[in-house]
């Protein structure tokens, strides 16, 4: 992975990790909690990183996401694929910045 996705990684590992329920029960609630605590510039960087990730083919995207999340989050139990999860993050955050 030659591009840094540190802001997205932090969002995923901290807000969607094992203690996700501290921040909400749905993806949208958790993202709203993220926006309440995070600098808007950092949230905008997450949107930009998600945009770059979404340009990847599905195999590379999945491999890169696994590296970013460090095994602490999988979107499938949330009814999402990696791609739909990142699209949801980008859409939700962008609409609120």
Predicted regions mapped to residue ranges:
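A short alpha-helix capping/helix-loop junction motif
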Residues: 27, 62-68
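Amphipathic alpha-helical binding modules
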Residues: 66-97
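Alpha-helix boundary/N-cap detector
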Residues: 3, 22, 41, 45, ...
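Amphipathic alpha-helical interaction modules
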Residues: 20-59
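Surface-exposed polar/charged interaction patches
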Residues: 15-18, 37, 53-56, 71, ...
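Short terminal alpha-helical segments
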Residues: 1-32, 90
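Short, charged/polar micro-motifs that form catalytic or ligand-binding hotspots
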Residues: 2, 17, 33-40, 72-79
């Amino acid at each position: 992975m030659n591009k840094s996705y540190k802001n997205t990684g932090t969002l995923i590992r901290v807000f969607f990790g094992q203690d996700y329920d501290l921040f909400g029960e749905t993806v949208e609630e958790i993202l709203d909690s993220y926006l309440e605590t995070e600098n808007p510039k950092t949230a905008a960087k997450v949107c930009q990183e998600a945009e770059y990730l979404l340009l990847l083919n599905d195999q590379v995207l999945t491999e890169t996401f696994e590296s970013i999340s460090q095994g602490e989050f999988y979107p499938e139990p949330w009814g999402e694929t990696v791609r739909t999860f990142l699209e949801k993050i980008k859409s939700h955050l962008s609409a609120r910045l």
